């Protein structure tokens, strides 16, 4: 009847309002304790994704991870939980192998880990067409910048009061894009990107909040001279930790 229809319409508006008004301040925060205290919780997944058509191993960390039953990714994927070395018995970590078909659409997918006791909090998992590289943890200064192939996607997490530095080698006139995905994939970091000369001294380009990227930075730059260049990723407030993770796609794309 009309009265019931109006009631459902008002409830629908309330649901939409809750979705639209979800506070940005909650992005990247640690997941709240699960309603089921025996359910698993997972920390940020590093690397933050996989190259489609390739298999990759991930060591998940968190709580209550023993006795796993599976992983839900939100896309077609082959997930294996190896049984060697007593994998699956440690409540704080678990190794999984993930392989996605070569025709998997590039994008962001939901990621959850399940055990016999429940299902974990949600993380974002990325499927990409670029090779995946993980930060080596030794790249906290321009002089120790981690060399990267191009194109690639680099995954890492910044430490407090420190940036992560990477080195790329380009040809004269080469155009490159640097797309930092952070807030868009649930990170706490308010990232900025900088491009320096090969010594890490002269700043060539900078971005903090790129339009349409939910405060994530993005730079497209044409290098006039061939050689090495330094890329820096840092939180604008110098914060850091496991929840301040990021991924930067590097290549000649729009």
Say what each PLM segment does.
Residues 1-6:
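N-terminal secretory signal peptides that target proteins for export/translocation
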Residues 9-23:
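Bacterial N-terminal signal peptides
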Residues 22, 26-40:
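Cleaved targeting-peptide boundary
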Residues 36-83, 89-91, 102, 116, ...:
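Acidic, Ser/Thr/Pro-rich low-complexity intrinsically disordered segments
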Residues 95-104:
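Extracellular/luminal low-complexity segments enriched in Ser/Thr/Pro
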Residues 104-115:
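A short beta-strand micro-motif common to beta-rich folds, especially ectodomain repeats
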Residues 107, 119-123, 242-244:
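Extracellular and select intracellular beta-sandwich modules with Ser/Thr-enriched
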Residues 123-150, 253-254:
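Predominantly extracellular/luminal regions of secreted and cell-surface proteins
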């Amino acid at each position: 009847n009309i009265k019931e229809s109006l009631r459902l319409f008002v409830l629908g508006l309330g649901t939409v309002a809750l979705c639209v008004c979800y506070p940005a301040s909650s992005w990247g925060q640690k997941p709240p304790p699960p309603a089921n205290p025996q359910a698993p919780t997972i920390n940020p997944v590093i690397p933050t994704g996989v190259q489609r058509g390739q298999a990759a191993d991930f060591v998940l960390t968190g709580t209550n991870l023993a006795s796993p039953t599976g992983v839900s990714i939100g896309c077609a994927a082959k997930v294996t939980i190896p049984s060697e070395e007593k994998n699956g018995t440690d409540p704080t970590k678990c190794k999984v192998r993930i392989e996605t078909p070569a025709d998997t659409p590039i994008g962001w997918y939901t990621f959850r880990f399940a055990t016999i006791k429940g299902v974990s909090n949600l993380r974002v998992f990325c499927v990409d067409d670029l090779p995946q590289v993980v930060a080596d943890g030794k790249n906290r200064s321009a002089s120790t910048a981690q060399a990267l192939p191009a194109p690639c996607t680099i995954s890492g997490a910044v430490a407090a009061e420190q940036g992560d530095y990477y080195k790329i080698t380009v040809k004269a006139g080469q155009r490159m894009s640097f797309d930092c995905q952070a807030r868009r994939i649930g990170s706490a970091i308010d990232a900025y990107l900088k491009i320096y000369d090969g010594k890490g001294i002269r700043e060539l380009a900078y971005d903090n909040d790129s339009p349409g990227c939910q405060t994530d930075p993005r730079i497209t730059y044409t290098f006039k001279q061939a050689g090495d260049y330094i890329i820096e990723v840092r939180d604008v407030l110098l914060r850091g930790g496991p929840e301040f993770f990021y991924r930067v796609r590097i290549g000649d794309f729009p």
